[in-house]
Amino acid sequence: MTNFEPKKLKNVWTIEDSISTYNIDKWGDKYFSINSKGNISVTKDIKSENKIDLFKLVKELKSREINPPLIIRFNDILKDRINALHDSFFKAIKTYKYKNIYQGVFPVKCNQQKNVLEKIIDFGSQWNFGLEVGSKSELLIGLALLENHNSLLICNGYKDKKYIEIATLARKLGKNPIIVIEQRDEVKRIIQAVQELNATPLIGIRAKLSSKSSGRWGKSIGDNSKFGLSIPEIMLTIKELKEANLINEMKLLHFHIGSQISDIAVIKDALQEASQIYVELCKLGAPMQYIDVGGGLGIDFDGTKTSSNTSTNYSLQNYANDVIATIKDSCELNNIKHPTIISESGRAIISHCSVLIFNVLGTSHVSSKLQIFDKKNQQLIISNLLETYYELKKLKNKKINLSQIIELWNDAKKFKEDCLVAFRLGFLSLAERAYAEELAWACAKEISNNLNNDEINHPDLSEITETLASTYYANLSIFKSIPDSWAINQIFPIVPIHRHLEEPFCKGNFADLTCDSDGKLNNFIDDGKIKSLLNLHEPEKDKDYLIGIFMTGAYQEALGNLHNLFGSTNVVHIDINQDDSYKVKNIIKEDSKSEILQLLDYSSASLVESIRINTESAIDQKKLTIEEARKLMDQIEISLRKSSYLSE
């Protein structure tokens, strides 16, 4: 029996090696690092020295029976992101001597969770930070939560008569809803509501810009974009508002250039076009006060600071500077008063504060043991494969001849394929086919052990790493917890939260709990590059191997679905104290199986009763004893109260 072990890449593995491997110092934005124990640490804010140990936190949450998978939300990071956004705009206003203010709003669609929105409103209250809503349900949330009468409530999305009536009447409550006209037929509904309610709303217009956008959401802008008015439609709307004596309520211009804009040049072009539209609206007699630059402010998921879909080639300060400078220049050239600037920056505010933690249930990988069969009566094609394996073993510790290794690898692949053909035709037994596959894996492992990283990545050998990769089974549903990974191939930073004093010599990807081949994570940030495999540790027997998926705060909870009936995970809100301790502020318990079934109109009581009737029948037929039936029913009733995820 021959054993082949994972190749050790370095004699001594350091924390700096882990930081470089996972690019933590680049995408972590100073919020995440690795401490002296080799665990991920979380910082209170980018200016603070206060940190907590994430691995220790998860272990202590487990002692409270708050088990993975779970979302940990760091309130301090959320607050710091809001502060950073405002600080950037305040610096830009001061630098460019802008004669008005920045007043942001948070788009509710990014994260509708009550605890999250309450924190955002609280943290942003000193700046009159408001909300942006895109439906009647979100409008009701905004009206209920926004108590600051100086905050803005930007009303976007499709609007029927009821939506417009609610927003119009809410102004009499002292609220500041601004109804943004995004479709031409909304003008008529607004005029009708004013006539019927004897109340006037604040009005805005969303413009369709002709500037070109980029990235995954590039089609959010342009003549064929989903929302907004073309220039001719804007002219007609202004005419109708004047005729209805509503032009004095026209206060805001809004535009949107897509989400996660990676290239600052795209933002500049859109700002120039929108600023000129704003100037022209003022010239047409609208008493404009606000320009809403929408969303699009991106974050650096991969830490490369480039214009790729998963990064940005600009900083928060760059963004604020360009917004302020561009709007100022257009207004001053036309003697127009500087407007209050609004942005709908969701992803940039909410992403960093949430970390999804899951445990690894097990792994699968190519066999690490090779059975050497008796050569007597051995099929020729298997003998050829075995001979190739021995040729590769002879090269161990010798000077590398890459062309010879490539030739031997091509031979191994050919002989393995010959074995598969022979098996299909009935010339090889199942045991012989298994041996052939083990030989091919052994050839791959010998090559991997003899080559360095650059050599193994040769185009003719690169598939070897994939062949030897392990699958790590993750205790989570990708479709529920990180649906963007599946739906749009969004890259999130994924890192073990402990064991960073050890070399992660395994290469692997993750498979989730669902019975779906799409339920895999196989795109990772590796030393600043996107790769299909991640450096991971071999899980230790009877010990948790815990993985963190970072920057998951935007959209994931809202978009997650119940594929295979895996429900919401535990959610914990954490405050980091000045003494490097923490306080658990909120715990939102995971969905039980009973709660999930109830969502689909299944009554737990009815299900239990149906199964009970079946057990009684089985008892009558002597298929089940009374004791077995009792144990079965007990387990079912307990299970209904428990998590949909796997437990220890």
Swiss-Prot record:
The modification N6-(pyridoxal phosphate)lysine is found at K109. The keyword GTP-binding does not apply. Its EC number is 4.1.1.19. GO terms for biological process: arginine catabolic process; spermidine biosynthetic process. Its cofactor is Mg(2+); pyridoxal 5'-phosphate. It comes from the Bacteria. Belongs to the Orn/Lys/Arg decarboxylase class-II family. SpeA subfamily. Catalyzes the biosynthesis of agmatine from arginine. This is Biosynthetic arginine decarboxylase. The lineage of its organism: Bacteria, Bacillati, Cyanobacteriota, Cyanophyceae, Synechococcales. The gene is speA.
